[in-house]
Amino acid sequence: MVENIEVSNLNVKVFGKWDTKVEVRDPSLKKYIDLMSIYLPHTGGRHEHRRFGKSRIPIVERLINNLMRPGRNKGKKMLAYNIVKTTFDIIAVKTGQNPIQVLVRAIENAAPREEVTRIMYGGIVYYVAVDVAPQRRVDLALRHLVTGASEASFNNPKPIEEALAEEIIAAANNDNKSVAIRKKEEIERIALSSR
């Protein structure tokens, strides 16, 4: 006989350690940063056929998927999983906070609000500043965080786990040492000049 167990009573944590009850301060990103409690962040691409399906993937898995960029880590999800797991341990030791909260803060700070698009009118190309969609803001923030970490650890004795932890912590503190913060400011500066 199977007992009815309430899902809310189950205490599922990411990697068996980290609670996903964190605060998203940016109201526009709240819907697109999924904080679902899941022990193993691997949905297996079940979102693919739904519109805006990737917004229902846990944010930790989206970070893992972004680590599998073409190049050295292409397709190696277990390697990316272990990188993020170790990174979260380093973040917890350095900051004393929940690493998922630090990651969410880093995404909020590194997400650009405005960018430039090309408009062709009468054979002349104009660059026009446009607002960035919330889904794209999260995508760009994750991409820039991962790119900054991989650039910092490439041809360098520093492991990628440490580089990613430093990148996330710097972005969470809105520090200019973070590549993601610098790229965001550059994108917004270009958009401001082409208004």
UniProtKB/Swiss-Prot annotation:
Q: Does the keyword Metal-binding apply?
A: no
What is the annotated role of this protein in its UniProt record? One of the primary rRNA binding proteins, it binds directly to 16S rRNA where it nucleates assembly of the head domain of the 30S subunit. Is located at the subunit interface close to the decoding center.
Q: Which UniProt keywords apply?
A: Ribonucleoprotein, Ribosomal protein, RNA-binding, rRNA-binding
Pfam families xrefs: Ribosomal_S7
The gene name on file is rps7
SUPFAM superfamilies in the record: Ribosomal protein S7 (SSF47973)
**InterPro entries cross-referenced by the UniProt entry:** Ribosomal_uS7, Ribosomal_uS7_arc, Ribosomal_uS7_CS, Ribosomal_uS7_dom, Ribosomal_uS7_dom_sf, Ribosomal_uS7_euk/arc
* Annotated GO biological process: translation
Q: What protein does this entry describe?
A: Small ribosomal subunit protein uS7
Q: Which organism is it from?
A: Sulfolobus acidocaldarius (strain ATCC 33909 / DSM 639 / JCM 8929 / NBRC 15157 / NCIMB 11770)
TM annotation in the entry: none
Output the superkingdom of the source species: Archaea
Subunit and partners: Part of the 30S ribosomal subunit.
